[in-house]
Curated annotation (Swiss-Prot):
Gene Ontology annotations for the cellular component aspect, listed alphabetically: basement membrane; extracellular region
Assigned keywords, A-Z: Basement membrane, Developmental protein, Extracellular matrix, Glycoprotein, Secreted, Signal
Annotated glycan sites: 135, 159
Protein name, as recorded: Abnormal cell migration protein 18
Organism per entry: Caenorhabditis elegans
Length: 228
């Protein structure tokens, strides 16, 4: 009986431990719910972190797989990522330096079967350091010493041109920063620089949210920001 009781206690403790979730050092128990990365309502299920809903900047909850939702000129979509498997064994047997394979902006060398760098907006490979992708979104490419692990870190936005030095920190903008240039107000978001509001002279500088369209007295149709 004693042996059975100890075994039961051991199994109970073991089951409790594996049902926990570790999110960047914070431990959650099975069934706990919390907001992750400011935009995801998640829960802990049997040791795995699962997304329940997406969260907008104002706190509105979106169902996974629901239609797009517009809030303050921003369009939100809550969808599960579809992952494509990639294997270095697909590289040619006699590979050369032109035989690179790519996965989610990571470049992998087929000769060494190691990470080579990250791919910027122009399709160039950055071996290490800052680089820019679409909408002036600033990233940092970090390749581990053994080149078997790589990470792309979000660093905000880059308020410069292709001729400017991407390492110039005076041109780096922190995430969620808002600034105005002329009649346009910009915001550095998750996907780079976007127009947030317009202050058109024809509307007496009244603030207009991005995604808004209006007809002027002369019949011209104007929009604030790009509407896809």
């Amino acid at each position: 009986m004693t042996f059975t009781l100890r075994l039961l206690v051991l199994c109970t403790v073991y089951s409790y431990v594996i049902s926990q979730c570790d999110d960047n050092g914070v431990i959650y128990t099975n069934g706990d719910k919390w907001i992750r990365n400011n935009h995801f309502l998640v829960t802990c299920r049997d040791g795995n972190i699962q997304t329940l809903k997406c969260v907008t900047d104002s706190g509105h909850l979106l169902e996974v797989g629901s239609k797009s939702y517009v809030e303050n000129g921003y369009e939100y979509m809550c969808a599960r990522e579809v992952t494509d498997n990639l294997n270095t064994n697909t590289c040619p047997t006699f590979a050369d330096f032109s035989d690179d394979i790519f996965k989610d902006r990571f470049a992998i060398c087929c000769i060494s079967r190691r990470f080579k760098g990250c791919v910027d907006a122009n399709g160039d490979i950055v071996k290490s350091g800052f680089f820019v992708i679409g909408n002036k979104s600033l990233k940092y490419c970090r390749i581990q010493a053994n080149q078997l692990q790589a990470r792309i870190e979000p660093k905000g936005c880059f308020n410069g041109t292709e001729k400017d030095d991407v390492n110039d920190e005076e041109l780096h903008i922190k995430k969620y920063a808002v600034w105005r240039e002329g009649d346009i107000e910009y915001r550095c978001g998750d996907d780079g620089v976007h127009i947030q509001r317009c202050f058109p002279p024809e509307l007496k500088k009244k603030a207009i949210w991005a995604g808004t369209a209006w007809i002027q007295e002369d019949g011209q149709v104007k929009t604030c920001g790009k509407i896809n």
